[in-house]
Amino acid sequence: MKGLFVTIEGPEGSGKTTLIKSLLPYFEQKEQKVMATREPGGIAISEDIRTILHKQEYTMMEARTEALLYAAARRQHLVEKVMPALEENYLVLCDRFIDSSLAYQGYARGLGMDKVFEINRFATEDCMPSLTIYLDIEPEVGLARIGKDAGREVNRLDMEDISFHKRVREGYLQVVERFSNRIVLVNADQPMKKLIEEVVQIIEDKLL
């Protein structure tokens, strides 16, 4: 099997993290070299930036500052972890990537998708995923899931009002339309077992 850069996207509470935790052992059993990582984060520098981005008390953070911090974390994560893994023929499963910035900062924050895309083109040197799975869910459903997850730490973005989260979903749907050649929309409001089966099939079809 060959390596592949796969990103998992979706609004808050869409089940990205749970999905990736289930995909990892599945592909390991198939003797596919596989690695799971996340954005912002995945390596020390980017995890430190994540801490800054998620601090609840930093409500004064300006939208451009936010976008640039995400891009900085993305750059370091890409060159330090993702690219070396792809060179070693790994299947890389990444929780969020550039599409999150387009939906959250580009659309929901109002910076403009084209501007945010250009920032990230500079950061990534046009290194894009081969496949993106977008987990679509109504904001009310996703936020309700978060509310029931006692073990999940509430971050700054979780504290935004419902109108912000609705804009995030609207932004994602525009991103899906814009990059339909690499993004597959999957309904996240279904039992996790069915969701895993559907996503496994999509990834395996791409690996062949």
UniProtKB/Swiss-Prot annotation:
**Residues that bind ATP, according to the entry?**
10-17
Which GO MF terms are attached to this record? ATP binding; dTMP kinase activity
Question: Domain of life, per the record?
Answer: Bacteria
Supply the CDD domains for this chain.
Answer: TMPK
What catalytic activity is recorded? Answer: dTMP + ATP = dTDP + ADP
Q: Which InterPro entries match?
A: P-loop_NTPase (IPR027417), Thymidylate_kin-like_dom (IPR039430), Thymidylate_kin_CS (IPR018095), Thymidylate_kinase (IPR018094)
Database matches in Pfam families:
Thymidylate_kin
Q: Could you say which enzyme class this protein belongs to? A: transferase
The UniProt keywords, alphabetically, are: ATP-binding, Kinase, Nucleotide biosynthesis, Nucleotide-binding, Transferase
Q: Which GO terms describe its biological process?
A: dTDP biosynthetic process; dTTP biosynthetic process; dUDP biosynthetic process
Tell me its EC number(s), please. Answer: 2.7.4.9
> Which SUPFAM superfamilies does this entry report, sorted A to Z?
P-loop containing nucleoside triphosphate hydrolases
> What GO cellular component entries does it have?
cytosol
Q: Which family does it belong to?
A: Belongs to the thymidylate kinase family.
What does this gene product do?
A: Phosphorylation of dTMP to form dTDP in both de novo and salvage pathways of dTTP synthesis.
What protein name applies here? Thymidylate kinase
Gene symbol of the encoding locus: tmk
